[in-house]
């Protein structure tokens, strides 16, 4: 999971900055609070995507405007979407910590990494098998594209 968030950290951070979001430690903590609440709301409503493989294959072939419309209609605000938001926020926070830590940044000695690992663990606790791993990866990749394409 850490490999995943590290691989998307710079991209997540750049997108958040472009969208005017607060990427500071406190901004990321506040965002995680919101995303966790939205996750539980989606779970309580039973909001989920039935076959993410099929939808992902279809969505990734679409031009940007059509992709955004499909994501908004079929994936946005589902439990998987909110888990992706949690991972993306953790990745954004990781990039903030890395850049703030300078050349000698050591994640093992970073309070930011220690704290953001709770968000990663929250997502990991929702994964019960390979299908969940694949779902998180597919939705996270689509969510990154969706975030890059939308305003604010």
In which residue ranges do the predicted regions lie?
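Flexible "arm" and connector segments at domain edges
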Residues: 1-152
């Amino acid at each position: 999971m850490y490999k995943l968030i590290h691989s998307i950290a710079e991209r997540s951070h750049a997108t958040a900055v472009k969208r005017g979001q607060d990427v500071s430690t406190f901004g990321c903590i506040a965002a995680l609070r919101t995303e966790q609440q939205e996750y539980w709301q989606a779970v309580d409503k039973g909001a989920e995507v039935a076959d993410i493989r099929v939808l992902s294959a279809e969505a990734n072939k679409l031009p940007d405007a059509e992709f955004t419309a499909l994501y908004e209609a079929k994936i946005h605000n589902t439990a998987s979407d909110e888990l992706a938001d949690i991972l993306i926020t953790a990745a954004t926070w990781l990039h903030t910590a890395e850049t703030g830590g300078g050349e000698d940044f050591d994640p093992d000695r970073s309070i930011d990494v220690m704290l953001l690992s709770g968000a990663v663990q929250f997502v990991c606790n929702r994964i019960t098998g390979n299908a969940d791993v694949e779902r998180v990866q597919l939705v996270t990749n689509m969510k990154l594209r969706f975030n890059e394409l939308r305003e604010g």
